[in-house]
Every structure is written in C-alpha cells, then in structure tokens.
Amino acid sequence: MATVPTRSGSPRQLTTKQTGDAWEVQARRWLEGKGLRFVAANVNERGGEIDLIMREGRTTVFVEVRYRRSALYGGAAASVTRSKQHKLLQTARLWLARHNGSFDTVDCRFDVVAFTGNEVEWIKDAFNDHS
C-alpha cells in the first residue's frame, strides 16, 4: 500500500480506494498529454464502474486503469479478466444508453492503462463487444 506524508511529518498509508484514485489521476494526465480529452471519471452504472471516459477525436474511449507494484503475478494489464471486461462492456452500454447512444451509433473503444512498478502501458482497443 502506498504512503503519503502528513502535516506531522509521519507517513500515513493510503487506502486501496485512495491509491486507485491517485493512479486514475495519473492515467488521466498521461492520456491528456497524448491528446485525449477528459469526459468523466468514476462513472457508476448498475453493476459496474468505468474509471475514465475520454475522447480521442470522435471516438469515445472507456478506460480501465490498473496498478500493480510488480509483474510478479502477471502485472497490471493481466488483471483485466474476462469477467471484468464483461462488467465494463455492460457499464458502457448503460452509460451510452443514458446519453442517447449505443455501440451501433457511437464510435467507441476500450483501453487499458496499466501501471506496473514505474512502467506505464497503454493498450488501445484492449477488448470490444465482439471479444
């Protein structure tokens, strides 16, 4: 678990949620540096959450952010399982419907930004609704 200094000078451990939020901010900044535009963060729909929604040109990009300290057990990208992909697809489907769209009418893709140790990996179009 990550630590941050406090006003008293002694480090305080971050919760899992705080650590995840911090890496999502890093991913957002990194993607913005690559030219993507921010749309939303931590989008919750029935049964799931999408970490980031970005735009690249006319494409809506649903982003899953993952962090692992090391690649000992496969690294961050390997942690996006088929079950997680299914939840992300369902959540995106609901979000699109709420915004008067669907996979048939909106150009979209699913990316993974994986932080493993000090390395960042951007997997564009990591999976889709036909996977």
From Swiss-Prot:
InterPro entries: Restrct_endonuc-II-like, tRNA_endonuc-like_dom_sf, UPF0102_YraN-like
Biased composition (Polar residues): 1-19
Chain segments carrying region Disordered: 1-20
Gene Ontology terms for molecular function: nucleic acid binding
NCBIfam families: PRK12497.1-3 (NF009150), YraN family protein (TIGR00252)
Protein family membership: Belongs to the UPF0102 family.
Protein name listed in UniProt: UPF0102 protein YraN
Originating species: Escherichia coli (strain 55989 / EAEC)
Gene encoding the protein: yraN
